[in-house]
Amino acid sequence: KARRNGFGGSDSSILLGVNPFTTLRQLLIQKATPELTEEEKQVGQLAAVRKGNDLEPLIIQKASKILGMEIVKPPHMYMFQDFPYLKMNFDGVGKTEKVENFQLPEASDLGKYIPVEIKVATEKGQRHYNPFVAVYSEVVAGKLNPTTRPILADVSNMDWTIEKKAEYYGIPQYYYTQLQQEMMALDAPYGMLAVMFDADWSVSIFFVWRDIKVQNRLKIEGFTAWQKVEDL
C-alpha cells in the first residue's frame, strides 16, 4: 500500500526514462490502481527475488566487515518531507564516522549517513556490471584475491547521459538513479552499491558520487508524474 502512495527508489529510472523494462505510462497506471495486480503478486515468487531477500542480510554483514562500517537496515518506508510524492526505503544505511577499513574521500563527510544498496547479480545479470571499477572486489580474474581500488572522480557535473554516468561507475543505470534518490533522502555526499555475484559467490562494492542534476530531475519528473496519477 505504501508503494502506491508515491514513487520509491525502484521507480526512479522509470521517471527519468532510463528503465528498459517498464514505461512511464505503465508506472502511472500501476500507481493509480489501488490493489496489486496478479503480475505484481507473482513477483515475490520469482527465484531471483526470493534469493535476493534471503541473501540481503548476508551481503549487509559482508559489506559491513569489508568497510569496517556498521550498516543497519531501517524497517520503514519514508516520505520526503518537502516532496511527499517521493518515498524511500533502504536496504542498508551506514555512518561514515564508523568507517575503519576503507579510505573515504573527505574528512568533512565524516558523521554523514550514506545509503548502501544491496543487490544479487545472477550469472545473466552480472554483464551489466564492471567490477574492474569497483572500489572493492573479492574475486579478481577468477581467483579469491580481495582488492581495493581508488575512488573514481566525481563526474556529476559532466554533460553526460545517465547511462554514461552509470557505465562510468560500473553499474546499471536503474541502480544509479535509485542510489541518487537514496542519497537525496539522506542528504548524503555519496552512496555505495554492494553486489554479490551469483556465479562466483563474490562481493564487489561500487562507489557513486551524489548527482544534484539527477536528483533535481527526480523532484521535477516525480511531481509531474504524480499529478498525472491523481488525474487517472
What residue ranges belong to the model's regions?
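Charged, glycine-rich intrinsically disordered N-terminal tails and low-complexity linkers that flank
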Residues: K1-D54, L58, N145
